[in-house]
Amino acid sequence: MTQLAIGKPAPLGAHYDGQGVNFTLFSAHAERVELCVFDANGQEHRYDLPGHSGDIWHGYLPDARPGLRYGYRVHGPWQPAEGHRFNPAKLLIDPCARQIDGEFKDNPLLHAGHNEPDYRDNAAIAPKCVVVVDHYDWEDDAPPRTPWGSTIIYEAHVKGLTYLHPEIPVEIRGTYKALGHPVMINYLKQLGITALELLPVAQFASEPRLQRMGLSNYWGYNPVAMFALHPAYACSPETALDEFRDAIKALHKAGIEVILDIVLNHSAELDLDGPLFSLRGIDNRSYYWIREDGDYHNWTGCGNTLNLSHPAVVDYASACLRYWVETCHVDGFRFDLAAVMGRTPEFRQDAPLFTAIQNCPVLSQVKLIAEPWDIAPGGYQVGNFPPLFAEWNDHFRDAARRFWLHYDLPLGAFAGRFAASSDVFKRNGRLPSAAINLVTAHDGFTLRDCVCFNHKHNEANGEENRDGTNNNYSNNHGKEGLGGSLDLVERRRDSIHALLTTLLLSQGTPMLLAGDEHGHSQHGNNNAYCQDNQLTWLDWSQASSGLTAFTAALIHLRKRIPALVENRWWEEGDGNVRWLNRYAQPLSTDEWQNGPKQLQILLSDRFLIAINATLEVTEIVLPAGEWHAIPPFAGEDNPVITAVWQGPAHGLCVFQR
């Protein structure tokens, strides 16, 4: 039998050099590591990794070729109280594997044991890693590098975005290929999108609990192989990587960036009762934050938390991010529960992973977006990330909903959020673009559901409606659910228009949830993470609706307003913004705090947003000049207005002079 040569300790993973494959694996506490390779008949062949350089185990298998299936058995102590859970009866996934063969099904054999080890061998049913070789012609691909001030983000799910699209070939709907189809690209261009932000595409697993209920993890925030593409989104698992890169190349040619939602905060191994796939059996003590009793710190709500202050885990995370940039040409990342990235265990701006990203010539040049919280004490860190990061601005989301959906909110608070939440983000040299403004996201109500439901309706998730937030700041306008009288439909439409206008014409970086521009509803489900069905798949029959045109017109209007695209903080007297009351006078201190919800926002001295968020028709005296409404607010008869605009109840209009 072929023997392993010692090989090299870097890079991590399995790498083919034309003559054989070099295998490397980190484990600081292992006593022995076996490489297990499987032939075409499924027969297992085991080799001890002969090289041991520091905490890196390595070996070189001559004559091995791409397509070889492999895994690891890692020997070491079973000492749960100390955080060690080695079990060589279990075949483990290489954390740096580029492709996985097999499914992560709920099976007792895929568990290591809780207090006592389960020594039943699982190689027959465990997923295997696959050695891949990387040859791809990027042609003249170049990143668009859209300036932050001009960036419009569109958050979408790979499958849900195109699975029901009637103009995309049936055989590629819901796949990576569909993202690069001309129909999809033309739609994004016409809408005005500059960056497509994809929910997780790294391989993930469905939680055993969901599988037992006949459900699946749809969103993908349960990662199992961070270097491997999720194969279900590919036309063929063997060509997934090229399909994905083809889509990115096509999007880049159209000037559209691709941002990946990435999950570095936890793994699909969940809590101690969860499955054993990889990290827990390779070096549980190093990869995870471990409590004094040997259990996990659950700062993510998912059962475990990756220890991103450990040097080896920092190297692993950094290598993963570089892989997606260098191999797939992605343009940035949105980091799920990103406060975990800064835990040491307390949150620090100079945490090891932040420092590694800052010092990396590759990662420091791409767009970085944080979901700036986790669920642990001290986990809410909005505004506290290092200067390279932009952050989801939940202050904006809540203020916009409260202002327009009949909750109390002073004008001053609304204006502060409209002005990129400078009280939160104007520090450490950060620019207004650091505020990622959103009204909705994958997590929560869709925009249509915000105006149709007062309460969540998550019964389909199998948790008796306990899951999902109860703090929605929504308003059903008098009737719970979709449909209703013409008057009800019109009032809901007006609220949607107001929320979209606030999102797309405010300072900061706007993020639009895919489907909001044509009224997608999840029927009140505000936590549809396990709904891989028509509840979450976008219905494109409404894509030519007036709402889509309204949204596109707003985006194109935004691009014409210097105060919004120059990405500079607004200062008193700089001509970027003036805040006026209904009489076109500067607001008094009392009006800012106690005045009616009536406001005029003059941008770049030429564009005026006139707002009447009260329940009464109100005369709004415009500033001096000849004003006319501009699309999408201009009607067929669009007379010049020189004095007064009749502001409808709960309405707004944008003018230009």
Curated annotation (Swiss-Prot):
Protein EC: 3.2.1.196
Cystine connections: none
Disruption phenotype: Disruption of the gene leads to overproduction of glycogen containing short external chains.
EC category name: hydrolase
Biological function: Removes maltotriose and maltotetraose chains that are attached by 1,6-alpha-linkage to the limit dextrin main chain, generating a debranched limit dextrin. Shows only very little activity with native glycogen.
Family of the protein in this entry: Belongs to the glycosyl hydrolase 13 family.
PANTHER family: GLYCOGEN DEBRANCHING ENZYME
Name of the protein: Glycogen debranching enzyme
Organism expressing this protein natively: Escherichia coli (strain K12)
Gene that specifies this protein: glgX
